Amino acid sequence: MVRNALAAAVLSALLSGPVLAQEASPPPPPPAPTDWRAISPSDLLVIDTSKGRILVELAPELAPAHVERIKLLAARGFYDNLAWHRVIDWFMAQTGDPLGTGDGQSWYPDLKGEFTFRRGPDMAFTPVAAPTGALIGFVRSVPVQTQPDDLMAGTGDKKVHGWGLYCPGVAGMARDEGNDTANSQFFLMRQAYPALDKRYTVWGRVVSGLDVVRALKASPTPDGIVTEPDRMTRVRLAADLPQAERPTVQMMNTTSAAFRALVDQARQAKGADFSVCDIDIPAQVTPGA
């Protein structure tokens, strides 16, 4: 993607003898207060749009330079009133261009690609699957794939490679054909699109308002360019908003028993088709004024 250019079958078993009734598995217990973690206001991006509010948790562990750029531009009001100029249904919604054509960017220099990151033993990471030679799980709310821990001992920095996975709600940075050409334009995933993995920098994930992302006006044409597009009306870090206007978000802690039960439930429901993208981490949002 350049700046201009993302049933289950039901089986019935007939028994020769009497039909044996099977009780449905009880739902997991409601999470306890300790099963939640608060997102810091300095890592919560508040995107108000003409269709409603989107809240994005930033992930500086994955892309520190890109997160710093998003914070800088938000603080300067750069994103206010910019269009969602490229929106493709079943793919993504793109914005951040002051020209509204796909050719614009901020006055700051382009960023070096942060397509992968280094994960050490001190980085908070919750695995949910372990395919051969890899671990798949979460850093904060962001789904990631990484090399296994046992490879850390053999690396110079005692860390292993990891990268964000483009599940619904994941926030990525748009760029031109060159790897180091991201600047101000970004996109939010409407659906999963794994072809983007390790090709575009992941810097966060929508934790509230995915329905808003999916409601943004989409283009009827393959290029995704939208006429009379929806707009971002204001973009700020929660920390930069007045206290009375500041939303707060509690995310289910991925280290909790409640989260493990949620993962088990998703795995049982999907069977062999289970993917980390099937896991929706619950959030409790206090909207603010």
For each of these PLM feature ranges, what is it?
Residues 21-289:
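Cyclophilin-like peptidyl-prolyl cis-trans isomerases
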